[in-house]
């Protein structure tokens, strides 16, 4: 019983996503109120009819009172509604089976908004343009766009419920230093440098290349001048890869799950996402640029082996555990794991995709820079990803700076800044005028030239300056025209619409070479990804420890032992119910820790039945010395959720803490642990400190 909707203030649907149960419930409700002989409207219109009163009342309250409701429950607590306004449009999430909390629903809405930004870039700044992208006039094109985001939302929901990396929103790495180093060298010499040296690349330049095994990062390489990818962007890329090339489950498991009667089903709006097995977690992301060849790694006490050649292609206080927590993982079921669902994914090579990620251009930060992503499948579950930039990338920086300048000007005018000499004296206004004059000089569009002349006559006239209201109107027109240029430059020319991209033979060559290099490791990698980090090596030093998740929030990387609540996938906790029970405890601990961190609590200790749960957040300097703790900001219930996909909370937290430590770099860490309840609290805290120190020291070890 789940639904997500994006609508205008007039209740026009721009996007929707429902599961089968919600759609059926809505159909039955409308059948009772409509004449049985009349044909029911399409689902889009049904949702508009259902939610129009909510949407219109919410927007009216906002207009009249400058405030509105953001969450409510229906009678008898049957349905939970969460509303979040982004720009001009209202995002609504509904849950009717009590499987998601207010925080879960709000996080889902923020992730959806982030996915819109990744796909449309700065076009999302303009309400009219993003409306045309999300709701094209052509019905077939609209269905294609909606299906794409429905599938992405379904994939995200699945990964969030199954993958520890998506639960805590941090990148996990497959830990094998030897293979990691070999793979990085191959990416550097035979992929990135080889493609960039080819005269046939058509102006495209490979910036980043990385290897994924399921959701784990095996190796990552960045070329000359490439910016560091944010953890949120890397997680988004992993999500896109899992959507394009979903990791297959076993046929037996799919049959068993199809026959189950689990109440929680994945919505059929994303039917082409096959089953994925639970996967284990890892540690720091290995990266190496052409400027710096050292690769970060974690050296954990594990045994590694080189596989024999493949025989061939066949080869703070006591708290009460909240009711209604995360259900056991074995209750999760994929409704689309059917032959029809599996067949809907074509085995052909995915086409290049235009995406927008944060980057630095000419040493200037620029959000939502256009890139082209190439997902090159090596084997089921193993993929190579390339990210390229085009020669027109510098235009993105210019457009962002102009849009940012006009947005700041709008803010000043709305705050009561009068037009005239006071406005002209603002330093950013002179800089904006200079950049815009230079930009207009190199553009041939008559419309934007005329609008700019109109703006200058109103903003910089000493005799008859325009009013603030007039300047706001012209500012809005200029921003829209800049967004139109952005759209024509980067969306209309996207590879999926016939725009420039790497020649197919260069992609094929890189794909073939990487397959040859990894052929002898293929089976090992697939097994290793399921059992990446084990608890065995920790039990002797940390008796009573059941599970942990360690996160370096500065780099957005994490390490955790594997959790496999799957009947077919054995783990140290055995099969089925026990592993599922522990997983449910861990997921509930993650949610509870976020809730208390939102209220300013950085330490959490409590007992629930046979387990003691703990959560710690702390800061260190680059030498690994713990820094004095401060009070972290308290956030409202309707604020952007804690995490990195929906909003970069930890980057803001680091910036906030660094104000009190301006002379040294600051790092942020989190540790979540699950112990047996026989372990005393003081010993638990001691173990947590020792575990954090051990993992922290390992994370600073580099490969030879």
Curated annotation (Swiss-Prot):
Biased composition range(s): Polar residues: 269-288
Tissue spec: Expressed in all tissues examined with the possible exception of skeletal muscle. The highest expression was observed in lung, liver, kidney and spleen.
[DE]-X(4)-L-L repeats (start-end): 45-51, 520-526, 648-654
Biological processes annotated in GO: blood coagulation; cell morphogenesis; eye pigmentation; gene expression; inflammatory response; intracellular transport; intracellular zinc ion homeostasis; lipid homeostasis
Annotated GO CC locations: BLOC-3 complex; cytoplasm; cytoplasmic vesicle
Residue ranges, annotated region (Disordered): 246-350
Pfam annotation, one family: Fuz_longin_3
Keyword Repeat annotated: yes
Keywords: Albinism, Guanine-nucleotide releasing factor, Repeat
GO MF, one example: guanyl-nucleotide exchange factor activity
Biased composition (Acidic residues): 251-261
Subunit structure, interactors included: Component of the biogenesis of lysosome-related organelles complex-3 (or BLOC-3), a heterodimer of HPS1 and HPS4. HPS1 cannot but BLOC-3 complex (heterodimer of HPS1 and HPS4) can interact with the GTP-bound form of RAB9A and RAB9B. HPS1 and BLOC-3 complex do not interact with the GDP-bound form of RAB9A and RAB9B.
Function noted in UniProt: Component of the BLOC-3 complex, a complex that acts as a guanine exchange factor (GEF) for RAB32 and RAB38, promotes the exchange of GDP to GTP, converting them from an inactive GDP-bound form into an active GTP-bound form. The BLOC-3 complex plays an important role in the control of melanin production and melanosome biogenesis and promotes the membrane localization of RAB32 and RAB38.
Known disease link: Defects in Hps1 are the cause of the pale ear (ep) mutant which exhibits hypopigmentation associated with defects of multiple cytoplasmic organelles, including melanosomes, lysosomes, and granular elements of platelets.
Official protein name in the record: BLOC-3 complex member HPS1
């Amino acid at each position: 019983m789940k639904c997500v909707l994006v609508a205008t203030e007039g209740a026009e649907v721009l996007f929707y996503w429902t599961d089968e149960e919600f759609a059926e419930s809505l159909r039955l409700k409308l059948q009772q109120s409509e004449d049985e002989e009349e044909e029911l409207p399409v689902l889009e219109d049904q949702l508009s009819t259902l939610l129009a009163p909510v949407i219109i009342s919410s927007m009216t309250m906002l207009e009249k009172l400058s405030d509105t409701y953001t969450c409510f429950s229906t009678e008898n607590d049957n349905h939970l509604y969460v509303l979040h306004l982004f720009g001009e449009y209202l995002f609504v999430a509904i849950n009717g089976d009590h499987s998601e909390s207010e925080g879960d629903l709000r996080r889902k809405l923020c992730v959806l908004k982030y996915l819109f930004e990744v796909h449309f870039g700065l076009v999302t700044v303009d309400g009219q343009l993003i409306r045309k992208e999300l709701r094209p006039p052509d019905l077939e094109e609209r269905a294609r766009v909606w299906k794409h985001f429905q599938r992405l939302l379904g994939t995200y929901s699945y990964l969030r419920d199954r993958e520890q990396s998506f639960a805590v929103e941090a990148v996990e790495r497959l830990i094998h230093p030897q293979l990691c180093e070999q793979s990085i060298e191959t990416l550097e010499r035979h992929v990135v440098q080889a493609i960039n040296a080819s005269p046939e690349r058509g102006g495209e330049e490979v910036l980043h290349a990385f290897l994924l095994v399921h959701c784990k990062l095996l190796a990552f390489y960045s070329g000359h001048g490439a910016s560091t990818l944010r953890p949120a962007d890397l997680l988004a890329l992993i999500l896109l890869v899992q959507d394009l090339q979903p990791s297959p489950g076993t046929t037996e498991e799919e049959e068993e799950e199809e026959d189950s009667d689990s109440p929680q089903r994945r919505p059929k709006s994303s039917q082409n996402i096959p089953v994925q097995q639970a996967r284990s977690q890892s540690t720091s992301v290995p990266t190496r640029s052409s400027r710096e060849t050292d690769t970060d790694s974690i050296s954990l006490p594990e045994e590694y082996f080189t596989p024999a050649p493949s025989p061939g292609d066949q080869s703070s206080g006591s708290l009460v555990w909240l009711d209604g927590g995360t259900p056991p993982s074995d209750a999760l079921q994929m409704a689309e794991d059917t032959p029809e669902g599996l067949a809907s994914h074509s085995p052909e090579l995915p086409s290049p995709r235009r995406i927008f990620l944060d980057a630095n251009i000419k040493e200037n930060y620029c959000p939502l820079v256009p890139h082209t992503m190439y997902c090159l499948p090596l084997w089921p579950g193993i993929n190579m990803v390339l990210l390229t930039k085009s020669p027109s990338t510098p235009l993105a920086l210019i457009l962002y700076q102009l849009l940012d300048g006009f947005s700041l000007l709008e803010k000043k005018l709305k705050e009561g800044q009068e037009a005239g000499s006071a406005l002209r004296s603002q330093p950013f206004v002179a800089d904006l005028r200079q950049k815009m004059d230079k930009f207009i000089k190199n553009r041939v569009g008559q419309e934007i030239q005329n609008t700019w002349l109109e703006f200058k006559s109103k903003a910089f006239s000493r005799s008859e300056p325009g009013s603030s209201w007039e300047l706001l109107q012209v500012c809005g027109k200029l921003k829209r025209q800049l967004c139109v240029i952005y759209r024509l430059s980067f969306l209309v020319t996207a590879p999926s619409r016939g725009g420039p991209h790497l020649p197919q033979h260069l992609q094929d060559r890189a794909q073939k070479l990487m397959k040859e290099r990894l052929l002898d490791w293929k089976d090992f990698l697939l097994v290793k990804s399921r059992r990446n980090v084990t608890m065995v090596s920790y039990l002797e030093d940390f008796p009573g420890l059941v599970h942990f998740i360690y996160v370096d929030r500065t780099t957005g990387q994490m390490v955790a032992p594997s959790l496999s609540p799957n009947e077919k996938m054995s783990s140290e906790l055995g099969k089925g119910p026990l592993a599922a029970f522990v997983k449910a405890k861990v997921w509930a601990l993650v949610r509870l820790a976020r809730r208390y961190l939102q209220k300013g609590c950085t330490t959490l200790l409590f007992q629930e039945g046979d387990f003691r749960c703990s959560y710690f957040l702390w800061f260190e300097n680059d030498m690994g010395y713990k820094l004095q703790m401060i009070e972290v900001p308290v956030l409202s219930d309707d604020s952007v959720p804690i995490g990195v996909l929906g909003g970069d909370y930890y980057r803001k937290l680091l910036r906030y803490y660094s104000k009190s430590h301006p002379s040294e770099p600051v790092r942020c860490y989190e540790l979540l642990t699950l112990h047996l309840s026989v372990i005393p609290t003081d010993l638990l805290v001691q173990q947590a400190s020792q575990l954090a120190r051990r993992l922290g020291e390992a994370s600073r070890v580099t490969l030879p």
